Amino acid sequence: KHVYVEKPMSHDVFEGRVAVAAQKKYGVVIQHGTQQRSNAGRAGLHDQIKAGKWGRLKISYGYCCKPRGSIGHKKFGEVPAHLDWDLWKGPAVIEKFHGNYVHYNWHWFWATGNGDLNNQGTHELDVARWAIDDDQTHPVRAMAIGGRFQWKDQGETPNTLFGMAEYPNGQQVFFNVRNVNYNGYKRQVENQYYFEDGGKIIGNQYYAKGSDKGEKIDFGQGKVTPGGNWGSFVAACRAGDPSMANGDVNDAHYGCVLGHLMNNSYRLGEEVPFNLKAGKFGDNKDAAEHFGKLHDIMGKGVGVPEKDNYYTVGPWLNFDPQKETHTGDFAKDANQLLKDPNNKGFEVPTIDKV
């Protein structure tokens, strides 16, 4: 059957790889629920970026900064009579039931979700990766720094995160998650583009290096299958043509893996004092600058004091884009995160069994 799959397509790297193999074997349409892929204007902008209209793209930056709130604490207890708990869990291995595992808060536990990075952030991660050169699939290394600040609740995933990834050609993706609310909060769910000559695109404005005066740009119209995400999916199914999907299985996989790798780094991180020196950015001045902006918001806006607060700083994780495995330092532990353990009876099949 053809499949329209909501984001994120996968909960781990292995699941995505299996989906790619299944699509290749059966030749069906698989369309990801990343609606920006049906936006002809966004496609047109990316065509111009790749053609070098503003010079070479250096950093493609995604933001998932939307206010959320504490989920509190739910006690472990009996499964409600109306809930088929085993079916609800599916492949996820969860020993005991509590109310925060069921809709919607399952997003904030590693067994069932990926945090906002690969929840809402899947949309902006996909756009960020879409803008870099077409021959780039997976990054060769990634890291993340963040934490779960202020709420002191039951959730496990970070509500604040700065992640970055480097691709084989040197292009980078930066990503910012910020969910903690505060007075004057700026909701920021968008993408920005930074070029090697110092220029940048924010919104529909291009800013030359050193200028605070933007020039409105015409995104143009790129090639997409008409009808929006639903209409294009139906058209692709009727035509029996997987290439008509706006956001096919490969793009879904590459975009989700980008988030998984940042999350893997975070999950292997260690606590360091909450200050500007927390990041492991080496000589990457761009990363230090953008992390500094996030830290400033968390300190001055949210009001997180430096004393007795900590960032979780993940290591740089190397990744082989062809083999889809971690290499080098931390590889043993990181590779354990590429495939989740599965609940009996709901095992994700291996590639040879799809």
Task: State what each model feature region is.
Residues 21-28, 44-58, 76-79:
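Basic phosphate/pyrophosphate-binding loop/patch that engages nucleotide-derived ligands
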Residues 86-171, 180-185, 250-254:
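Rossmann-like dinucleotide-binding domain that binds NAD(P)(H)
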Residues 1-38, 314:
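Beta-strand-loop-alpha-helix segment that lines the small-molecule cofactor/substrate pocket
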Residues 153-155, 161-229, 248:
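NAD(P)-dinucleotide binding in Rossmann-like oxidoreductases
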Residues 61-101, 339:
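Core domains of carbohydrate- and sulfate-ester-processing enzymes
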Residues 56-59, 96-98, 135-144, 172-176, ...:
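Acidic/polar loop patches that form or flank catalytic/metal-binding clefts of enzymes
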Residues 95-105, 226-237:
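Active-site-adjacent bridging/hinge elements
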Residues 237-354:
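C-terminal helix-rich "cap/oligomerization" subdomain common to oxidoreductases
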